[in-house]
């Protein structure tokens, strides 16, 4: 049984989903989804928005049924918090702060950045790391930046089966990477965007928080519904790192004298070298 998309034209209208961009900023390839031009703005055909949204829901259910993950992408100001909350609630991955180049096409580099994040967390938790207060403060600052950029993908160990994107023009690098790898892209597309590289177009106002939230919530609910019907647990993408037993923080006696200086210098050198080469901090 498919997830019933109960969203109405009235709700879309009230959210402002029908407002496109100025006629001078349109992309002709969006013409099939435009209802009319009014007062210098293009008005999106919400009947087509609703029809496309129902197709999108079916696609999401198929993706979950194939046991593939979904990556929500929305780094613009209006979308980032909505994307983060929705992804966490339905247990899927997200990129809401910054799209790191190679997040899909060079996953090995991103995984190395995640390892650096995990290692920094271990050092911050250990009371005998051998680091000075200044080094610990710098480490904490870099940890915040790393966590900010990697929070939603730190557990993404394989390529997603679907990207859900807010404004493919703004997220063109993410869309291009997905295209290179043959990963289908679903996107909220405004009248100024090129829908050509998008597999599942949802025409709507992608600058209005009300419009974004309304549509993203439908997509999120479709994910949750599919997982419940299939008995798939919802695991938060922002859970702490899963560490093997040998990586657990261990309290060891501190070395003394020259041995302490040597250990601190060696560990510190390796640590800062790893951090300086970390892609997510650039």
UniProtKB/Swiss-Prot annotation:
Residue ranges, annotated region (Disordered): 245-265
Single GO biological process annotation from the record: translation
Annotated CDD domains: RPS2
Coiled coil ranges: none
Annotated PROSITE patterns: RIBOSOMAL_S2_1 (PS00962), RIBOSOMAL_S2_2 (PS00963)
HAMAP family in UniProt: Ribosomal_uS2_B
Protein name in UniProt: Small ribosomal subunit protein uS2
């Amino acid at each position: 049984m498919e997830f019933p998309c109960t969203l109405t034209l009235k709700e879309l209208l009230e959210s402002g989903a029908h407002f496109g961009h100025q006629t001078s900023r349109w992309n002709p390839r969006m013409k099939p989804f435009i209802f009319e031009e009014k007062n210098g703005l293009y008005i999106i055909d919400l009947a087509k928005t609703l029809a496309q949204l129902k197709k999108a829901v079916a696609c999401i259910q198929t993706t979950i049924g194939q046991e593939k993950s979904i990556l929500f992408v929305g780094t613009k100001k209006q979308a980032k918090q909505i994307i983060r909350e929705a992804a966490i609630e339905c247990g899927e991955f997200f990129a809401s702060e910054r799209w790191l180049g190679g997040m899909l096409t060079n996953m090995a580099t991103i995984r190395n950045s995640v390892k650096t994040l995990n290692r920094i967390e271990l050092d911050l938790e250990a009371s005998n790391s051998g680091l000075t207060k200044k080094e610990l403060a710098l480490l904490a600052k870099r940890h915040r930046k790393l966590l900010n950029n990697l929070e939603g993908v730190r557990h993404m160990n394989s390529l997603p089966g679907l990207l859900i994107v807010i404004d493919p023009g703004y997220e063109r690098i993410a869309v291009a990477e997905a295209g290179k790898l043959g990963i289908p892209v679903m996107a909220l597309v405004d009248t100024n965007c090129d829908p050509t590289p998008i597999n599942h177009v949802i025409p709507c106002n992608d600058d209005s928080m009300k419009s974004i939230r309304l549509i993203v919530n439908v997509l999120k609910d479709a994910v949750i519904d599919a997982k419940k019907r299939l008995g798939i647990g919802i695991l938060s993408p922002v859970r702490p790192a899963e560490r093997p037993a040998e990586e657990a923080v261990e309290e060891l006696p501190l070395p003394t004298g020259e041995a302490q200086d040597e250990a601190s210098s060696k560990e510190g050198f390796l640590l800062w070298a790893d951090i300086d080469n970390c892609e997510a901090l650039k």
